[in-house]
């Protein structure tokens, strides 16, 4: 069945570029375009598209207000089209709280060398969006930033970190930012484990996601950098466009594990790749690994989960009932790799029980 798409952007050039990209895909047809949020909302109601590509910064009615009204008046999967820049990235992350399914980076120019690769990513996300479970995209604006006293306590605790006793590795794609916020904000400050995350997102957005989660979580959260130590109570998120692996080093006759980032080939169309992280931690940490495969498209993570199982680690898949898209966890279940299948709101409790 052909996917009917509506493109909403105040730039005539971007509307044309996106429309041309989407119409090249035989499974997608652009049924309309809109020049601002007000125009877009009217066309969503009139045309009833399967997916909306929505600019996050527009005149008349901005992206967030438009998104909120779409989800209230005519619930439809929405993919945010965002430029880079701290303000745009912050608005995009807020859009996930309002119910956006995914984000794509705004094309910078038709002649860009990366355009074919970007076009494939755009089409892939648009093909996935209509599969989203809109029931699990209801507005979630209930996680408040930590107060200054708690933040100071968290920062002081970071100075005392030791090598991790356990490794919690998380892979997510479509619907992941919301799922990560719910999960990570449910974990205790004194978690006796390091947390490593791969979330499929364009470059730039993972830094904003890390800052946002750090402001709301009792754990320290940061975008991973080359050479970062892997430590208890710290969440490291792979930066967009970089694979994240673990390497073991000797420092003053003591072994420690650190982060290694690389721009190796994409795996299953993704960089960072969940498979790359999972294989790496399986080889370094073996049975101390607890891996979680959350909501997301395609099957990234399944091959890596198989390696984790071989080394004695645990694999937990998110249940269909709480997923936005059941692709990645569904593949884990299909291949009989899951030790447990749990809805998102039960995962933190089970992680704490396993780690003890």
UniProtKB/Swiss-Prot annotation:
Active site: 173, 200, 300
EC number: 3.1.1.61, 3.5.1.44
Pfam family, one: CheB_methylest
Modified residues (4-aspartylphosphate): 55
Single GO cellular component term: cytoplasm
Family per record: Belongs to the CheB family.
Family annotation (NCBIfam families): PRK00742.1
Descriptive protein name: Protein-glutamate methylesterase/protein-glutamine glutaminase 2
Source species of the chain: Methanosarcina acetivorans (strain ATCC 35395 / DSM 2834 / JCM 12185 / C2A)
UniProt lineage: Archaea, Methanobacteriati, Methanobacteriota, Stenosarchaea group, Methanomicrobia
């Amino acid at each position: 069945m052909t996917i009917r798409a509506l493109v909403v952007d105040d730039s005539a050039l971007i509307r044309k570029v996106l429309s041309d990209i989407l119409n090249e895909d035989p499974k997608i047809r652009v049924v309309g375009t809109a020049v601002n949020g007000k125009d877009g909302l009217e066309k969503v109601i009139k045309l009833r598209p399967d997916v909306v590509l929505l600019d996050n910064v527009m005149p008349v009615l901005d992206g967030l207000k438009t998104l909120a009204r779409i989800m209230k008046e005519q619930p439809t999967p929405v993919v945010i089209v965002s430029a880079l820049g701290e303000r745009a990235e912050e608005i995009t992350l807020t859009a996930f709280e309002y119910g956006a399914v995914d984000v794509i980076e705004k094309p910078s120019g038709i002649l860009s060398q990366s355009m074919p690769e970007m076009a494939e990513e755009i089409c892939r996300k648009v093909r996935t969006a209509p599969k989203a479970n809109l029931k699990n995209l209801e507005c979630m604006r209930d996680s408040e930033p930590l107060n200054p006293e708690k933040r100071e306590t968290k920062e002081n605790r970071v100075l005392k970190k030791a090598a991790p006793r356990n490794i919690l590795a998380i892979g997510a794609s479509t619907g992941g930012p919301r799922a990560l916020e719910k999960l990570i904000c449910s974990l205790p400050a004194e978690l006796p484990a390091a947390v490593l995350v791969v979330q499929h997102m364009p470059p730039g957005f993972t830094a904003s996601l890390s800052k946002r989660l750090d402001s709301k979580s009792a754990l320290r959260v940061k975008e991973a950098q080359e050479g970062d130590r892997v430590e208890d109570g710290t969440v490291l998120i792979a930066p967009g466009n970089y694979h994240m692996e673990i390497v073991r080093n000797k420092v003053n006759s003591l072994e420690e594990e650190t982060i290694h980032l690389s721009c190796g080939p994409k795996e299953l169309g993704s960089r960072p790749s969940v498979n790359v992280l999972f294989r790496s931690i399986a080889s370094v940490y073996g049975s101390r690994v607890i891996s979680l495969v959350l909501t997301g498209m395609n099957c990234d993570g399944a091959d890596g989960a198989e390696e984790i199982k071989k080394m004695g680690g645990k694999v937990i898949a998110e249940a269909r009932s709480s997923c936005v898209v059941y692709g990645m966890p569904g593949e884990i279940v299909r291949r009989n790799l899951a030790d447990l299948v749990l809805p998102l709101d039960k995962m933190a409790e089970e992680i704490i029980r396993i780690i003890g």
